[in-house]
């Protein structure tokens, strides 16, 4: 969705007469074929770096903008630079991508530089999971679990001791605690997970245009049940400046926040790519 929105916004912008948009995807994506000037079906992202470089050279591309899983392309930055191709992957450097994509490492780095993170425990087996749940239930009124690696909230659950087992089939984000422990114990191999307090406060999403660790523009979308509010000034913007600088963010990215019980904003994650809803703010003219 965001790739189509980026193309549409470019075609509607003042740059439309001076740029040619070439899009590629590992899937057919007919909507991209409609809006882009040219579309190519690319190999799976893990094997696409050489193919993308060849296409950029063939079509005389000046700038390559990558979306999801861009860390596979970031590893080849030097090769693109040698061919005078500007590479936009969401962050500069493989180490920065590794830190952003590992939610535990990301939290540790936020804590180290004094930013408002959400405390968490990393677990790698059933015994560690049960111990972490017991520890965090003693500290916080509500807890949740999410995988160390993942996108789009896949695998996230709020854990409740009294939730009916069938609740998981009605509301996928709520799971009985014992049921989750039992299901996790059946994984082979186990998946690294985080246990952390569940924050039920307001959530916001900051859409950011940045260049080599410096913010060029940002706007916050505060999420309500049936609508979103766009703010040109927001308390999270100062935090975003620190995050963008520390992780050397570059391009169009998104940073998620949520309020704790004291209404303080806490960092959820950095998405080194445009959020699915970033086009909701296009009426502001900011991004």
Name the predicted role of every residue range.
Residues 1-93:
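ATP-binding N-terminal substructure of ATP-dependent carboxylate-amine bond-forming enzymes
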Residues 60, 84, 114, 140-141, ...:
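Residue-level detector of structured alpha->beta connecting loops
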Residues 97-192, 212:
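Active-site nucleotide/adenylate-binding loops and adjacent lid/helix of ATP-dependent enzymes
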Residues 153, 222-229, 271-284:
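Glycine-rich phosphate/pyrophosphate-binding beta-alpha loops
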Residues 169-243, 247, 258-266:
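Phosphate-binding site of ATP-dependent enzymes
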Residues 235-261, 272-287:
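Active-site "cap" helix and flanking loop/linker of ATP-utilizing ligase/carboxylase catalytic domains
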């Amino acid at each position: 969705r965001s790739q189509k929105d980026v193309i549409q916004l470019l075609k509607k912008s003042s740059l439309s007469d001076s740029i040619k948009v070439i899009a590629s995807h590992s899937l057919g994506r007919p909507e991209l074929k409609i809006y882009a000037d040219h579309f190519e079906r690319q190999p799976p992202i893990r094997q696409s770096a050489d193919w993308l470089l060849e296409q950029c050279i063939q079509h005389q591309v000046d700038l390559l903008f990558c979306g999801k899983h861009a860390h596979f392309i970031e590893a080849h930055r030097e090769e693109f630079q040698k061919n005078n191709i500007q590479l936009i992957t969401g962050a500069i450097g493989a180490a920065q991508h590794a830190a952003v994509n590992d939610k535990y490492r990301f939290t540790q780095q936020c804590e180290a530089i004094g930013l408002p993170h959400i405390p968490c425990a990393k677990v790698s087996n059933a015994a560690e999971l049960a111990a972490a749940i017991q520890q965090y239930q003693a500290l916080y009124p509500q807890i949740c679990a999410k995988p160390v690696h993942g996108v789009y909230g896949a695998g996230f659950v709020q854990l409740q001791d009294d939730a009916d087992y069938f609740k998981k089939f009605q509301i996928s984000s709520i799971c009985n605690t014992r049921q989750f422990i039992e299901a996790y114990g059946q994984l082979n191999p186990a998946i690294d997970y985080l246990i952390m307090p569940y924050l039920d406060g307001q959530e916001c999403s900051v859409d950011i245009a940045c260049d080599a660790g410096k913010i060029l523009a940002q706007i916050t979308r505060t999420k309500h049940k049936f609508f979103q509010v766009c703010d040109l000034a927001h308390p999270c913007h100062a935090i975003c400046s620190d995050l963008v600088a520390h992780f050397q963010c570059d391009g169009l990215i998104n940073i998620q926040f949520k309020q704790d019980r004291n209404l303080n904003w806490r960092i959820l994650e950095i998405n080194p790519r445009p959020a699915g809803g970033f086009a909701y703010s296009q009426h502001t003219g900011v991004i």
